[in-house]
């Protein structure tokens, strides 16, 4: 059972890193569930304090993820249409078979959303840039946290490799 927990924990850690880029999967929280599974393993020991701290960070980043793109859009004069367009553009960008669709999609989505909001093209372009910048900032933060979690996970396994490799 311990091997199952450890393998599933690694899977969740890697899925969390991937989830940093996907809007439907909360990256740091998914990675945190990897810590939770590792915590339940009898072979690998680490403190409950680390588990609680990483949970608090993951929840904080998850909440922040909803505000950063909106703040970017607002700072550059964007509307709710631009923010919705960013999300729709991200989903389309993920599905579209074009290189860099994950980056082009949110920008185009925000631009189209602002144009639908009857903004002039200069305002729409500025707001689209703000939404896109907010999206990139949020994605970068989630990616960094998920990578730190993966690094901690590897460090915990490495420090207790004797127990893990004795299987």
Predicted regions and their residues:
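Short, non-helical or kinked segments that cap or interrupt transmembrane helices
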Residues: 21-31, 75-84
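Amphipathic, cytosolic membrane-interfacial segments at TM-TM junctions
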Residues: 70, 74-79, 115-131
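Final/C-terminal transmembrane alpha-helix of multipass membrane proteins
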Residues: 135-156
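Juxtamembrane boundary at the C-terminal end of a transmembrane helix
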Residues: 151-167
């Amino acid at each position: 059972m311990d091997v199952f927990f450890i393998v599933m924990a690694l899977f969740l850690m890697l899925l969390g890193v991937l989830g940093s880029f996907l809007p439907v999967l909360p990256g740091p929280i998914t990675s945190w569930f990897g810590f939770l599974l590792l915590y339940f393993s009898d072979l690998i020991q680490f403190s409950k304090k680390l588990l609680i701290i990483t949970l608090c960070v993951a929840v904080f980043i998850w909440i922040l993820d909803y505000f950063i793109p909106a703040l970017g859009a607002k700072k550059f004069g964007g509307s709710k249409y631009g923010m919705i367009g960013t999300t729709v553009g991200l989903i389309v960008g993920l599905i579209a078979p074009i290189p860099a669709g994950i980056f082009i999609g949110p920008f185009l989505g925000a631009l189209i959303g602002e144009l639908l909001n009857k903004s002039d093209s200069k305002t729409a372009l500025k707001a689209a840039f703000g939404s896109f910048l907010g999206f990139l900032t949020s994605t970068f933060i989630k990616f960094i946290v998920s990578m730190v979690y993966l690094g901690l996970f590897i460090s915990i396994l490495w420090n207790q490799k004797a127990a893990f490799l004795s299987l």
